[in-house]
Amino acid sequence: MSATHDPQTVARWSVGGGFLEALANRNFEALAGTLAPGVRFRAMLPPGPMDWEGADTVSDVFGSWFGQADDFELIDATVGEVGGRLHLSWRLRVRPAPFDIGDGWHVIEQQAYANAGDTIESLDLLCSGFHAEQRSA
C-alpha cells in the first residue's frame, strides 16, 4: 500500500521525530526548538492534571522528569497521526527515578497528541508514572 502525504502532514511528522530525537538525547534545548513559543502542554500525571505554557517552561518540565537520571534508555518510540493530530509515544528506562522514587531501574511510558505544523502548538499527554522495573525470572 502506498500513501501520499500533503506538506502539512510531512511537517507534523518531521517535528514529531525531532521532538523524540531531542528527548532520546536529553537535549532539552533542541526539544524546546520543536515547540511553538506559546505552546500549551496539558498532562494527565499520576498525581493529577497539570498545565504549562511556553516552550522553555515545557522543556524544563521534561528536564525535571528525565534530565537528572544517571542512566537513561529509550526503549521504544513511535510517530503517527490520529484524525489530523500528531501522535507520539515513548517508553523509557531511567535510573535513578526522579522525585526520590528509588535508585533502581524504573520504566515510564507516555502517550501524547499534538497540534503541530512546523512546531508543536499544543501537546496533550498521558503518563503511566515511573514504575520499578520487573525482571522476569
Regions found by a protein language model. Give the residues of each.
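A solvent-exposed, acidic/Ser-Thr-rich amphipathic alpha-helical stretch
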Residues: 30, 34-83
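A beta-strand edge to alpha-helix "cap/lid" segment located at domain peripheries
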Residues: 2-7, 60-137
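Short, low-complexity N-terminal intrinsically disordered segments enriched in polar/charged residues
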Residues: 1-33, 37, 137
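Acidic/proline-rich low-complexity IDRs
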Residues: 19-22, 30, 34, 44, ...
